[in-house]
Amino acid sequence: MPHQQILMLFGLLPVATNISTWWNFGSMLLTCSALQIMTGFFLSMHYTANINLAFSSIVHVVRDVPHGWMMQNLHAIGASMFFICVYIHVARGLYYGSYLNKETWLSGTTLLIMLMATAFFGYVLPWGQMSFWAATVITNLLTAIPYLGTTMTTWLWGGFAINDPTLTRFFALHFILPFGIISLSSLHIMLLHEEGSSNPLGTNSDIDKIPFHPYHTYKDLFMISSMIMIMLLTISFIPDIFNDPENFSEANPLVTPQHIKPEWYFLFAYGILRSIPNKLGGALALAMSIMILLTVPFTHTANTRSMTFRPFMQLMFWTLVATFMIITWTATKPVEPPYTMISQVTSSLYFMFFMSNPIVGWLENKIMKTQL
């Protein structure tokens, strides 16, 4: 709408008075992406995409480059902070019914897929033991695709095994994808401002709005400052909290780590993958764990938008949060009982939330009608 665009130019965009702190994570994500692009740019100046030099180039950045340790840690901790904010942002969208703004939700889910791909390519670049073996395990899943799988895997690797061409193309992809993320983020924000943000009540907030500036700008700045402070405290005192000890050893194709696992933010999807004993089934479940978010706007049957007044859905939502955490925890454990059974049960519960969403909505409508 032209009227809204003029208001945006002067920072007068009207926003609902009752939006809570959960609405601040969008601006925090923009800050994260800006930080990641800046630190990544400086790191790329010193990085060498060669299997014999990649690991040494990271060591060189940390030891010899002025403030290189800070750049490297900011980039690594920044990725974790990015995913913490993303998962909270998605959870808020699910809880408050923001997914009913279909275009914004679908562009956001596409952004999440692009972000996960970028993070995966980035995890391979240091060429440590876990980087190499995580890349081998995850890319090998393509071989599960009937007929085309082996050809696609060879094409992705640039050979018959993960080697120098693989690292070179992963670096190229890791460099180019963030620009796609920035472009899609712009589209995501434009689509959001076509309709405007929802609010915790899930009602139309046209009746009661305030200008975005100064109220929400200061609130955003406070949350961004808090996030940066947490990041700086983490890189100063516990910089390796999210790192795997195996990744401090250079990649060796002849030595397999005892327990192969990706970064913590992929563990829920990896846990779902591991819970299914069939390779193709596991690969499909892995893809569906993210793709199922695309179905949410089309399966909403409740008359109420937000979960604020939906106790049954609240129970299901917090069960989803608990299952997400339990799957993440089981993915860090060996593939043996009782962990396999726990991950199978929690994976089923994860998908059950999305499948039972329309049924619960329909039941709630029935209960509301009988009470009226």
Curated annotation (Swiss-Prot):
Its cofactor is heme b. It comes from the Eukaryota. Heme b b566 binds at H89, H188. GO terms for cellular component: mitochondrial inner membrane; respiratory chain complex III. A ubiquinone binds at H193. Component of the ubiquinol-cytochrome c reductase complex (complex III or cytochrome b-c1 complex) that is part of the mitochondrial respiratory chain. The b-c1 complex mediates electron transfer from ubiquinol to cytochrome c. Contributes to the generation of a proton gradient across the mitochondrial membrane that is then used for ATP synthesis. The cytochrome bc1 complex contains 3 respiratory subunits (MT-CYB, CYC1 and UQCRFS1), 2 core proteins (UQCRC1 and UQCRC2) and probably 6 low-molecular weight proteins. PANTHER family: CYTOCHROME B (PTHR19271:SF16). This is Cytochrome b.
